[in-house]
Amino acid sequence: YLVKSSHGLGAFFGVFSVLAVLPFALSYWEDRRNHYLCFVETRAGKTTYCWSHLCVTFLGAFLCIFLGMTAAYSLLLLKMPMLRASDAESLLYEIEMGDGKRNFLILSRTFPQMYFIASIAADAARYAFLAVTVFAASEKIKNLFVLASLPILLEYVSQILADSLGLPRWMRWYTFNGTSIDTLSDFLEISGYFLILSFLIGVVFWLLIRRRELDG
């Protein structure tokens, strides 16, 4: 239940956005507010500053979500089973019926652990992408409240645009999360998907910095 309820818009999304995403995503906003940019960019260079901060933002948010959720679920294991008997029976039934879609995770001897690790890692990559997006947006958006609300606004607006324009699934980034994990390839595809999106956002951020430099 906790794994499923942690996806989409809700209390989990708000908590993760505030506690994990924003501390890393607002580093550029903080540097600009305190006039650190001139000093840092002079010593390290704009390109180095840009990409080093983007990498720290992505990896920091990823590890924060991954390790935090892993610790939380590990504590729950002390009182609750990772996989209920009814769930185990359903999985065995799928295997007997020849459902090969879940062959990697179900047939693994450590299926519960593998499933939770893959699911949590996929969600962590998603939140890392949101952190990078807020980080890049802080180049243009100065209002802290708007930046803090950006993850929720981004998901709402993305859903509205995708439904209105009939966009294909690969453009609906908000649908990719831990519940989409069935095989190892699913996990690799989702993680790679958000990694590529984060890189593209990073390129946009770098171009914005270059443009600001040219404009003086």
Region annotations inferred by a language model:
Residues L67, A71, L75, K79, ...:
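Alpha-helical membrane-inserting segments
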Residues Y1-S27, C55-F135, Y174-F194:
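Secretory targeting signals
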Residues L144-S158:
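Central hydrophobic cores of alpha-helical transmembrane segments
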Residues S158-L184:
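Extended hydrophobic/aromatic segments used for targeting, binding, or gating
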Residues G45-T47, W51, Y127, N143-L147:
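Membrane-helix interface segments
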Residues Y73-A85, N143, D163, L167-M171, ...:
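Transmembrane helix-loop junctions in multipass membrane proteins, especially transporters and channels
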Residues S27-G60:
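Helix-loop-helix units of permease transmembrane domains in multi-pass membrane transporters
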Residues K140, L195-G216:
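Junction motif at the cytosolic side of a transmembrane helix
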